[in-house]
Amino acid sequence: MSRSTMLAHSAIPSSLIRMDLLSPWILTATAPKFLRLFAPATRRRSARSTIPSWSRSSSGKQAHHAWLSSITPCDGARSPWLARIPMAASSLQAQSPLGARRRVYQHLPEEADRLLKGRAQIVNVWRPLRGPVQDWPLAVMDCSTLAQAHIHPTKLYRNRFELRGETVSISHDESQRWYYLDGQQTDECTLIKIWDSKEGISGHMCAHCAFQHPNTPVDAPLRESVEVRCLVFYENQE
């Protein structure tokens, strides 16, 4: 089974192995590629640019629209003051239903009403530009461990008063399980579903963020990665 895996469903695929840690930063000598973590992460710097593109599958039943790319260099991310920022208050990412629908209207205004009558998703595609990743790897949460009480819709503003949209903030809880791909290579993409319009499913979104790994060598190359966010539509599903 490929290591490039969709990490947003209610159950972790068999290729992902969960491990309990003896203490927050003690890893076993025979640790597999996926490890359970309860450690803080810190904010990473990013430069964003819009990537407009539109394609349709040969069957005509699915369409997607890639609308955002985040080129992420991690230079400066090792500064001491950044290391004090907790995970839930820094770079943890997910998407609220209101914010997701707003994105559809923002990027596909003429087709939004029709597209949102069917099932819609937002899926992020994350890939390192330099590998293997040693500095600030990407971590994802097992969605089945995220309680609704820990999800908080959060307004986004520009210049303090101009409403830009809505995302979500997530409260930390000891029951949450986090995973990361150790030594991720440039040919290994991570697909992360951050929103799904279909109701009643357990894998509705996958929270994710970068974190400061305690075993990163001092001279490890700074991480560089690209992230593309895709709008996905299913015309024959509700």
Curated annotation (Swiss-Prot):
Coiled coil: none
Gene Ontology MF annotations: oxidoreductase activity
InterPro entries linked to this entry: AsaB-like
Pathways per UniProt: Mycotoxin biosynthesis
Superkingdom, taxonomy of origin: Eukaryota
Family: Belongs to the asaB hydroxylase/desaturase family.
Its job: Part of the gene cluster that mediates the biosynthesis of aspirochlorine (or antibiotic A30641), an unusual halogenated spiro compound with distinctive antifungal properties due to selective inhibition of protein biosynthesis, and which is also active against bacteria, viruses, and murine tumor cells. The non-ribosomal peptide synthetase (NRPS) aclP is responsible the formation of the diketopiperazine (DKP) core from the condensation of 2 phenylalanine residues.
Protein name, per record: Aspirochlorine biosynthesis protein N
Annotated source species: Aspergillus oryzae (strain ATCC 42149 / RIB 40) (Yellow koji mold)
Gene this chain is encoded by: aclN
